[in-house]
Swiss-Prot record:
EC number: 3.2.1.39
Phenotype for residue 538 to D: Decreases enzyme activity
Annotated compartments: Secreted
The protein's name: Glucan endo-1,3-beta-D-glucosidase
Database matches in InterPro entries: Endo-beta-glucanase (IPR005200), GH81_C (IPR040720), GH81_N (IPR040451), TAT_signal (IPR006311)
Keywords: Carbohydrate metabolism, Cell wall biogenesis/degradation, Glycosidase, Hydrolase, Polysaccharide degradation, Secreted, Signal
Gene responsible for this protein: Lam81A
Superkingdom: Bacteria
Signal peptide: 1-34
Example of a GO cellular component annotation carried by this entry: extracellular region
Upper classification of the organism: Bacteria, Bacillati, Actinomycetota, Actinomycetes, Streptosporangiales
Main location: secreted
Comment on activity versus temperature: Optimum temperature is 50 degrees Celsius.
Start and end residues of each stretch annotated as beta-sandwich subdomain: 38-251
Catalytic reaction annotation: Hydrolysis of (1->3)-beta-D-glucosidic linkages in (1->3)-beta-D-glucans
Organism, scientific name: Thermobifida fusca (strain YX)
Length: 758
């Protein structure tokens, strides 16, 4: 059974305990399309589900609709930390799974919202997984509430408002990542807090109570003029016909008075904005909260930051902190905080060095180009995507060695396949995209890995299509024009990560969780452990492809989206998948790397019964020039490679090319030597080719490792160092000559559409 088959099987069996685009302006997407096909330039998609195909479904295969309230008006979000509230994966569970917002965790139930603080890790599965499991300290509800289901009433960038109603009583709670508060609006009865153990009350201040339960400290705040009635494990506050309350998680009882001023400053919205400044090679991200004072005049709140945020923030930190599966969270005070990251460039390809054997490169390109099936039997969005990516990487190599006929033949292959997929030709079309206006998503058929039924992995799949489109655009700008294939390409891109908040066809950043700093793969998050992300590198591949495409078509919004995603995820990936700072994994966890990040922890396993090489490699592939982030710290890259070798007791034998490419980011000479000894006998990983691996290794053997101490005033550059010698590379996506200035004073003049090296 192939690794794909194993991956598909485990995903399928693991259970849980138009707006048409481009042409300069958006058109109104009809709520009930008059025709099955919606044309965008030369391309089209269908609004009718292909015969025999399935859209979003529950675990039994029955179609499901988003679980939202009657007053919900936003695009439907999937692939987030709270998605099990909106996507009912299991027919017997209308309330959703555990929700890990950090520092708090939650689970909706008929009588209210469970609230807990998972601050103690446990090791499970023979120590392969660490997890901070949700265990409720109390249920926040209304006296007599018996809601048949939980629904989503609204959301913002990292919060969600959950609705529990039974026709007489209604509880709406707003919860969010980094929020130590729970905000509740109630009607139909008294607010009710039922603890899971008798609490210790250490503070009574009329409408506010401080308690400790299960070793965790909370402050309960009801409206002024009300009091809390206490009866063993049940506390109630009569707020009349309707009212509000908040609950705060306190680091210690001594912090009661630091949280009380914000008890009635209810968070109503959260917003992430980012600004990329090429001149300074800086990405500035600002996280804002909007609050409403239910009493008093207080504004802002207290926010707990993940390590990738507080270690890069320019905002003053307090001395308050919490535990989380990502490491210690630090607290800021106010209505916003800002992070700053250095951008280290995204290249479309590496240069080919003169020392490489160009005749061998040509022969290896021909082996791919003239294979009996260059697509290797691919038919669905994932495997077709990987084949597109493999062939796309060969185009600039062929061009760099003067093999123009090979380059053009490869481009023809890419164009024909892309045009087939980007055109919906009716019921018999075996390669097309379908827009689901109920779920606000674009699904490619044939689908795979639950990209249709579970809305999994859209950025993983579609990133390959965007790479192919960017490669074509690099050599044929007319192909990507608004009159031809550009509108359909950018529609595919925007399904996965839409930067335009006014484009109601798709949610903003479906495949990226801005507070978490990375994406979530599962559309429904229907797991007791929350959501998960396995292949961080395929998410990074999408980001790189978006940045390159945006630059090539002159769309700064898409370019900056790609830069934001790539830079932010690189910061999170090294910390949460590879524990680069040493404080993400808990004490006693014996592994150097996890194959998957879960909402509740990390797992040294993957979705199929793979080898150690695959566990490490699924977070490296596909290897492209956008993968240089894996070598931003060559010592850390070397440690990761040695970690795998130590575990194996030998050099990698599976996906050897992926691991040679990764090894080359710290020891390119050794990686090239290994390739030279085995290049005629090894089997390439399905998304890789011998030509690309050889070119990658030979270039890095000459250039050295990535040098992040030097930046440039363009999104598309890299600097390498071999001893005292630096090599500078830049790409010019425009139609005019471009002078790139590096931070050490070096300049490169780059011809239109070309790479330059100095």
């Amino acid at each position: 059974m192939s690794h794909a088959s194993r991956r598909r099987w485990r995903r399928a069996t693991t259970s849980a305990a138009t707006a048409a685009l481009l042409c300069g302006a958006l058109l109104t997407f009809p709520s009930a399309p008059a025709a099955a096909q919606v044309r965008l330039g030369s391309g089209s998609y269908t609004t009718v589900l292909p015969p025999g195909a399935s859209g979003p479904s529950d675990h039994t295969g029955a179609p499901v609709a988003p679980k939202v309230t009657a007053d919900f008006t936003q695009p439907v979000v999937t692939n987030d930390w709270w998605s099990s509230l909106i996507f009912q994966r299991y027919p017997g569970n209308p309330y959703g799974e555990n929700l890990y917002a950090h520092p708090l965790s939650f689970k909706a139930q008929a009588h209210g919202l469970e609230v807990g603080y998972p601050d103690t890790p446990e090791l499970v599965a023979d120590g392969l997984k660490y997890q901070y499991t949700h265990s409720p300290d109390f249920v926040l509800g209304i006296h007599g509430l018996n809601a048949p289901a939980a629904k989503v009433a609204g959301y913002s960038d990292w919060t969600v408002t959950a609705d529990l109603s039974d026709g007489t009583r209604q509880l709406r709670t707003t919860i969010g990542q980094g929020l130590p508060f729970v905000y509740a609006d109630v009607s139909g009865g008294p607010i009710r807090v039922e603890f899971t153990a008798p609490p210790t009350v250490w503070r009574r201040s009329g409408n506010a109570v401080g308690v400790t339960v299960n070793g965790h400290h909370y402050a309960l705040f009801a409206p002024s003029g009300t009091t809390w009635s206490e009866s063993d494990t049940v506390f109630t506050a009569d707020v009349g016909g309707s009212g509000y309350a908040s609950v705060a998680l306190l680091p210690s009882p001594d912090d009661f008075d630091r949280y009380a001023p914000y008890a009635y400053s209810f968070v109503t919205s959260t917003t992430l904005t980012y600004d990329y400044d090429p001149a300074s090679a800086t990405l500035t991200s600002t996280y804002r909260v909007t609050t409403e004072a239910r009493e008093g005049t207080a504004q802002g709140t207290l926010l707990a930051l993940y390590p990738h945020q507080w270690k890069e923030t320019t905002t003053a930190l307090t001395d308050l902190s919490y535990a989380s599966p990502r490491g210690p969270m630090r607290v800021v005070e106010g209505d916003r905080f800002t992070t700053e990251l250095t951008t280290h460039g995204i290249l479309p390809s590496l240069p080919t060095v003169d020392s490489a054997d160009h005749q061998r490169l040509r022969a290896l390109i021909d082996a791919e180009l003239h294979a009996s099936d260059p697509w290797k039997g691919a038919s669905d969005t994932y495997w077709t995507g990987k084949a597109l990516g493999r062939l796309a990487q060969l185009v600039p190599i062929a061009d760099s060695i003067g093999y123009t006929a090979g380059r053009d033949a490869l481009l023809d292959l890419l164009k024909n396949k892309m045009e087939d997929w980007l055109t919906a030709d009716g019921p018999g079309d075996n390669a097309q995209f379908y827009y689901d206006d109920q779920w606000d998503t674009l699904i490619g058929f044939p689908a795979s890995f639950g990209s249709n039924t579970e809305l999994n992995d859209h950025d993983f799949h579609y990133g390959y299509f965007i790479t192919a489109a960017a490669t074509i655009a690099r050599y044929d700008r007319s192909w990507i024009s608004e009159e031809r294939w550009g509108p359909m390409v950018t529609t595919v891109l925007r399904d996965a990560n839409n930067p335009d908040r006014d484009d109601e066809r798709f949610p903003w950043l479906r495949s990226f969780s801005p507070y978490a700093g990375h994406g979530w793969a599962s559309g429904h998050a229907g797991f007791a452990s929350g959501n998960n992300q396995e292949s961080s590198s395929e998410a990074m591949h999408f980001a790189a492809s978006a940045a390159l495409l945006g630059s090539l078509i002159g769309d700064e919004e898409l370019r900056d989206l790609g830069v934001y995603l790539h830079t932010t995820q690189a910061s999170a990936m090294r910390r949460y998948w590879q524990n680069a700072d040493g404080d993400a994994f808990p004490a006693g966890y014996s592994h150097d790397v996890v194959g998957m990040v879960w909402s509740d922890g990390g797992d040294h396993r993957i979705w199929w019964d793979g080898t150690p090489e695959e566990l490490y490699g699924i977070n490296y592939l596909p290897i492209t020039a956008g993968s240089l982030y894996l070598g931003h710290d060559p010592e850390h890259a070397a440690a990761m490679h040695q970690s795998l070798v130590t575990r194996l007791g030998r050099q990698p034998q599976v996906w050897r090319d992926i691991h040679w490419a990764h090894q080359a980011l710290s020891d390119p000479d050794a990686a090239l030597a290994a390739f030279e000894a085995q290049w005629q006998s090894y089997e390439p990983e399905s998304g890789s080719s011998k030509a690309h691996t050889y070119q990658w290794l030979s270039t890095l053997a000459e250039f050295g490792t990535v040098d992040t101490s030097v930046t440039a005033d363009t999104p598309h550059y890299a600097v390498f160092r071999d001893g005292d010698r630096r090599t500078y590379v830049a790409f010019n996506p425009t139609g005019q000559p471009l002078t790139v200035t590096f931070s050490d004073g070096t300049t490169l003049t780059v011809p239109p559409g070309q790479l330059a090296t100095g």
